[in-house]
Each structure stands twice: as C-alpha cells, then as structure tokens.
Amino acid sequence: MTRRIRDYKFEELLERAYSKLPARTVSKETFEVPRAEVMFVGGKTLILNFKQITDVINRDPKILQRYFVKELGVPAYMNESGQLILQGRFSSHVINRLIDLFVKKYVICPTCGSRFTKLIKKGKVFILKCEACGAETTLEAF
C-alpha cells in the first residue's frame, strides 16, 4: 500500500528532499583569477597569460575572446602560444576589470557563490549550471 503525503512526518519529507539534492562540495579554498599580463606591440594589446586565465576560470578561450570583442568593440584573435591579441591599446586596468565582470556574471554561481559551474549555450541565451548546488541561471548571450 502506498503512503500519501499527509501520512509522512515533516522530518521524513525533509530528509527525502535533502536526499534528492546533488552532493554538496564544501571547499574552503579561495578563488583568485590571475591578473592579466598586458603588453603593447605597436597599436595592439597582448594578454600574455590569457590561456592561464581561461584555465583557472574553466571556460573555453573562445568564449572569453568573444566577450572581449563585444565589450571593447575591436577585433581579437589568439595566437599559437595561447595569447590574446586585441586591436588597439587597452590598459591592464581595463582588461582586468572586464575579466572580473566576466567572472562575476558568467562563472560564479549567483545562488551559492561557487566557481564550479558550466556555461551551456542554448539558442540565444547562456545557461549557467552550478555543479555545487544544481541551480540553473539564464544569462544573456553575447
């Protein structure tokens, strides 16, 4: 015979709900994105440690490259060394500010603050899926 919801005690229902949640990883480590190492060559800006930055934030370099193109309004490309080359001269302050904004919007989970997220593109929107709490947040694509 199956039990109805009102046959359960509150504690039993609460325990059942908790058992359905994904495992929560508690990490005390601090999340620090490396500061961009910027160098100017003629009228171009090179981000020397671009590959290292994308590895730390766990994002495809092409996505961060597209973000820079949209925000700065200039062409950009990656060389074989994993450096990003932007047309135009941009200070390290501007570059680091954009990286911080990208991380805040497209990496950090707005629900639990975890950095363990995946960015999934569906049509014209991104979905930020948190691997720690399971939350999904819809974001505007760029």
UniProtKB/Swiss-Prot annotation:
eIF-2 functions in the early steps of protein synthesis by forming a ternary complex with GTP and initiator tRNA. The gene is eif2b. Transmembrane segments: none annotated. NCBIfam families: aIF-2beta, PRK03988.1. Keywords: Initiation factor, Protein biosynthesis. This is Translation initiation factor 2 subunit beta. One of its GO terms (molecular function) is translation initiation factor activity. Belongs to the eIF-2-beta/eIF-5 family. SUPFAM superfamilies: Translation initiation factor 2 beta, aIF2beta, N-terminal domain (SSF100966), Zinc-binding domain of translation initiation factor 2 beta (SSF75689).
